UniProtKB/Swiss-Prot annotation:
One of its GO terms (biological process) is regulation of signal transduction. It comes from Isohalcurias carlgreni (Sea anemone). This is Delta-halcutoxin-Hcg1a. Belongs to the sea anemone sodium channel inhibitory toxin family. Type II subfamily. The keyword Disulfide bond applies. Coiled coil: none annotated. One of its GO terms (molecular function) is toxin activity. Is potently lethal to crabs, although it showed neither lethal activity in mice nor hemolytic activity. May bind to voltage-gated sodium channels (Nav), thereby delaying their inactivation during signal transduction.
Length: 47
C-alpha cells in the first residue's frame, strides 16, 4: 500500500505517494520517511 513521505510534499492531492506502508517497523534496507509515529505501521522508503 502506498503512503505519503514527507519528501513528497504537504499537499495530499498533488503529492506522489512514494512510500510503502510497513507493519511495525521498516524492513532492512528501508527507512521511515514520516516523522509521525504510529504504533501499528510506518511509512517506509527504500534506501
Amino acid at each position: 500500500v502506498a503512503c505519503r513521505c514527507e519528501s513528497d510534499g504537504p499537499d495530499v492531492r498533488s503529492a506522489t505517494f512514494t512510500g510503502t506502508v510497513d507493519l511495525w517497523n521498516c524492513n532492512t534496507g528501508w527507512h521511515k520517511c514520516i516523522a509521525t509515529y504510529t504504533a501499528v505501521a510506518s511509512c517506509c522508503k527504500k534506501d
